[in-house]
Structures are given as C-alpha cells and as structure tokens.
Amino acid sequence: MSDAIAGPEQTPNRNFGFALDVDGVLSKKTPLPHAIETLQLLHSQGIPYCILTNSGGVKDEDRAMAFTKQFHVPISPEMVVQSHTPFLEVAGQYKGKCILALGGISSKVREVARSYGFDHVVTGSDILTAVPNIWPFAEATEAYHKANAQPLPMGPDGHPMPISAIFVFATPRDWGFDLQLIHDLLVSHGGRLGTRSAFNGNTALPNNGFQQDGQPSLFFCNPDIEWATPYCEPRFAQGAFKAALEGIWASDKPQGTRMLNVYQCGKPTTESYKCAERRLSLLQKRDGRGEPLQRVYMIGDNPASDI
C-alpha cells in the first residue's frame, strides 16, 4: 500500500466518494489496523471523503484537528459531519434572533452555536442564573450553571429576547431542568419564558391550540437511544432525552395533540446524509477533481445507525 501513497497532486478524475463512520470503522479509542493507511491512500489518490459521526458537542474545527492528529492525514472542517453539523445550514433562518442551545459540557455548546453563525445564543445556565426560581431542584447543579452563565441578551423593549428556536447539540447533562425549559417554551406565548399561550387547549384551533402562538421550533441532532461508554452496559443518549420529552408532552395534553415543528438530524436520518453528500460535492468541485460525484459509499459498522 505504501507504494500507492503519493502526494495529493496525483488527482485523477473520480466520480465517487466515501462517507466514513469513526467508532468501529476507523478507530476504537485508537486507530484500527490499516485505518491510517486507508485515509492516506484516499488523500493521495484525490478521492473525496468525509467523516460522518454522531459525535458532537465540539466545534467542527476542533473535531477536524483531533482527527488530523489521530489519523496523521490532513482533515479539514469541511470533511467533518458531526451529528449537529446540519444545524449550520439552518443558522441563516435565525439571523438576528435568539436561540436556546442545550447539551454538552461547560460553554462548549455556545461556542459550537456561534461557530455556525447564530447571533444570540442562550444556554440553560444563562437562564437559571438569571431566574434562579425557574427550577426548584438546582441544589446539585447551581454552582456549575453559575460558572458557565452569561447575561441574557436583551431586546429593544428592555426584556430578554424571545427564544425563536431550541437546538439540542448534544445529550443534556441536566435532564430535569432542560426538559422543564423546553416544555415551558413550547407552551409559551411567542417563546417568552414565564408566559403561557391563551390558545393552549382550545379544541377549535389546529392541534388543540398548542404551538399555534409563535412558539420556537425544536431541533435534535442524534436519534440514538443508547451509546457505549466505559460502563458495562449502554447508557441513555439524546434519543432517550427526546423520548422523555415526548412522554411529558403527551401526558397532559388532549388526545391527538402533537409536538409540532420538530427537526431531527444525525445518522441515520436523510438530513445528515444529504449534508455529507453536499460537502463531498463541494470538496470535489473546490479541489478541481473533475466530473461531479455519481456515487457516495457509506462505510459503517452498525446497520441500525449507519444505513
């Protein structure tokens, strides 16, 4: 294989590319046998590829740097599709508006959201610090939230800006509080905390009046119910958090009331595969690799989440 690894200037026309999973395909904590050589071969032969993973919680740039170091081959941010990377493509819809970003640790979720172009980003820590009595069970987490809080962005009326969308970037660490926040906003008037829409429960309106009053849209990025950790059994992941929210939503609403305006990306959703395909096509065009892509091969190890 080493004889085939030349410089990246050897770029014959290719009309195919690869989307590669990481865990179980390229590495298991450390690179699997021949993973590094395979990526080097793709690079030297001018074959476009991207890393498609349900990991998240850090900026695409930081993930790309980590992959570059791990696999000893240059991987740019454009070659990385994390679970939340498709959020980048909807950021323009919220220009000048305020979003709630949930999940992950410390302030990393805020950094990720801002790297995608969201102008005004609020986290659960910001809200709990500004309105301590919004969550009565903060004894174990209050210090953590205060350490990671920033002031709430204010609107021209002197009040906190309304929340126009909720983005779950990674599995939340404070489930109870985050579930409360999301539910509060989904039944609010226009995405303003501390309000409740007068339309809720009106059976003469669509969806029994719920989410008919300017409430925020809701975005999830990883449908996995469980994931592998050092513990001997799988642990709950973001998909389980979404299921918990759906259970709460259904528990006290009139029969047939749906949770509307919910967007889901992350493997194996169509949105994530389309995002990967668009990125590969841009890489193909940017690097002058000849004809447009005709095929993209997905390499994974779990049909339930990779296909």
Name each model-derived stretch:
Residues M1-I307:
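HAD-like aspartate-dependent phosphatase fold
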